[in-house]
Amino acid sequence: MRVLAIGATGFIGRHVLRLLADDRHDVAVLHRGETAPNLQEGICDIRGNRDQLAECREEIQRFGPEVILDLIVYTERQARELVNAFRGSGGRIVAVSSADVYRNYDGFRGNATAPPDPTPLSENAPLRQTRYPYRGHDLPFAYAHDYEKILVEELLLGDPRLPATVLRLPAVYGPEDKQHRLQPYLQHMSGDGIPIFLEKGQASWRWTRGFVENVAAALALVVKDPRSAGHVYNVGDEPTFTEREWVERIAGVAGWEGEIVEVPRDELPEDTRQPVDWRYDLWTDTTALRTELGYAPPVPLDEALRRTVRWERSEPDGTD
């Protein structure tokens, strides 16, 4: 199978490339060349800007992709250009989306338009009624103003001439995670035994997470399986822990034996209170991916945490 991967040189993408190349698929990567991708032998390197696909159309056509995997389609304009570039080509799109499309995400961020939806959230759960969730926020992300995965999904799934699959990703963690999702707790665990304080609502809040190699395995599976066309799948590791359980798991791997204390919000120092509503879980149901396509995460939880903790502690500003 010939696979064109757009923006696959980073945190998640490099693992997807390895899996596809190891399975002897013909793989090409479209990227701007701003990072050193260290591509495996045999992977075709196409330099170009995903915002200007027309400029590298000839090179893409020579490669002749059967599947286009887009890990960095963030905006309506990008999705429309993707559809226009590949509509009628005989190819199939696999696009990365996010669990931030669900209505509970609005509630979690304090913009509730409805009571919390029941969890775990299936792929058919209500979506946000607001749009552009990061517009107006000071974020180090070039597409924050126009970011909207709901519009991306609608465009990609709405054209019968271009089969598409959408994968809604969880909070992804692991080595090379630029967001350092484990670091705040690990930093505390490297201290002098002061308890970790969790707001009461936070302690019972659930957020689906996924180890980077497990998420990559899900992407590679969908790329290889044409049965996925026309479907939306939630991705994530099981089970989805409460925040307290998650901290306890990290502590077990990190060797920390300190205390986790649940406190009312008004007893927390004001500068540590997070501007969120913990009643709105971001817990997604990943049953469909497992039952319909036979997905099974390759890396167990404890091993995933061990690798991540080891990497965090090896960083120059690590948490030893």
Segments (PLM) and residue ranges:
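Amphipathic terminal alpha-helices
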Residues: 301-320
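Active-site Tyr-X1-5-Lys
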Residues: 124-166, 181
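N-terminal Rossmann NAD(P)H-binding glycine-rich loop of SDR-like oxidoreductase domains
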Residues: 3-23
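Conserved C-terminal active-site "lid" loop/helix of NAD(P)H-dependent oxidoreductases
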Residues: 212, 268-296, 317
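NAD(P)-dependent short-chain dehydrogenase/reductase
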Residues: 159-207, 250
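Mid/C-terminal beta-alpha module of Rossmann-like enzyme folds, strongest
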Residues: 218-280
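Substrate-binding strand-loop-helix patch
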Residues: 176-177, 204-214, 232-253, 282, ...
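Alpha-helical substrate-binding/gating segment
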Residues: 186-197, 205-241
